[in-house]
Amino acid sequence: MIRKLIVKFALIATLLSAWGCALPQEGLLPKVEIPAVPLAAELKSSVSFTISFLPPPAAEAEQKLVEEFIQEFERANLFRMISSAPTAADVHMTVVLTQAVAVTPKHFALYLATGGLSPIRVPCIYELHAEIRSCLGKEVKYDIKDEVSKMVWAPGWPPGVDWHIDPTSSSVRRNLYRTLMMQMHRDGFLHHCGE
């Protein structure tokens, strides 16, 4: 009986510590929906990008993260083409997405006070830094930030950063990408430069 209880507790603690950098909740950034922009295909701009992630994820996770980025840009239907650099395009983007767990002394004190037996919610911060350059020479830098929470138990202390492809983390990243696209739209990066 006690052995089953210990096994269940260990399983739950392991699952919670391996959950990643998000809980089933929305981030703090307002959820963005891309409106339908009535542009003819020949008027849409093409995009060439480089994207990196900090801290660097494992190769398989990085491939999934890049696919997620491309899918969100394709789903928006705002661009004629999106491809990784170096490709001739109307818009060139350099994107860096960082993820960090912001543990404060308060979190550590709470962890010590509970003896690691109580889950502690710590903030996980996503920051998207993008440098956008159009073929007309216009350059803009964007810094977009969002935050979600991570539950930490004794086996998960100190909390680290893992790039998980779970639905909540993915939702937060995708919303960052949509926010970037809306800011690009506002700043006039959606039109084809012409020949």
Give the positions of each predicted feature.
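Sec-dependent bacterial lipoprotein signal peptides
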Residues: 1-21
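A structural "domain/chain start" motif
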Residues: 20-78, 83, 189-195
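C-terminal/domain-edge helix-coil "capping" segments
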Residues: 27-29, 123-127, 131, 139-195
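Short coil/turn motifs at beta-sheet boundaries
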Residues: 42-44, 88, 121-123
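A short, hydrophobic beta-strand-centered structural micro-motif
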Residues: 46-49, 83-105, 177
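A mature extracytoplasmic/lumenal domain signature
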Residues: 53-55, 97-99, 132-134, 145-148
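Short aromatic-glycine motifs in intrinsically disordered, low-complexity regions
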Residues: 80-82, 86, 117-118
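Surface-exposed short loop/turn segments
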Residues: 94-140, 162
